[in-house]
């Protein structure tokens, strides 16, 4: 089965948007932009998005698609004299999962 190009672009945009725990703004923004064409979009104080499809009328079945917008995240605590970074963990996850993984480092301006 060939995946629809629109769905592939959405998945790529969501995967590429930085979204460490507590800093999911860019992921929510991407989801909101894509969902705007589907129907009404509401957001609560926890940054949860609720998308109500325009076509959901009458006695049609309703389904829920649920997912997290956050990902594994770290904050740079300090930089050692040799250039190595010391991190503080955001959220709760297994630290061993990070060993030899690539990370994206951004400054306070998001650059």
Ranges and model annotations:
Residues 1-111:
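N-terminal hydrophobic/helix-forming segments and targeting peptides
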């Amino acid at each position: 089965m060939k995946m629809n190009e629109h769905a592939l672009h959405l998945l790529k945009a969501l995967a590429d948007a930085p979204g460490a725990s507590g800093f999911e703004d860019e992921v929510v923004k991407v989801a909101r932009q894509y969902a705007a064409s589907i129907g009404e979009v509401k957001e609560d104080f926890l940054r949860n998005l609720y998308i109500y499809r325009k076509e959901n009328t009458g006695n049609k079945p309703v389904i829920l698609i649920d997912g997290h917008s956050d990902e594994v995240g770290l904050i740079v605590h300090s930089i050692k004299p040799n250039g190595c970074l010391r991190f503080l963990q955001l959220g709760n996850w297994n630290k061993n999962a990070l060993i030899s993984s690539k990370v994206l480092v951004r400054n306070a301006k998001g650059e």
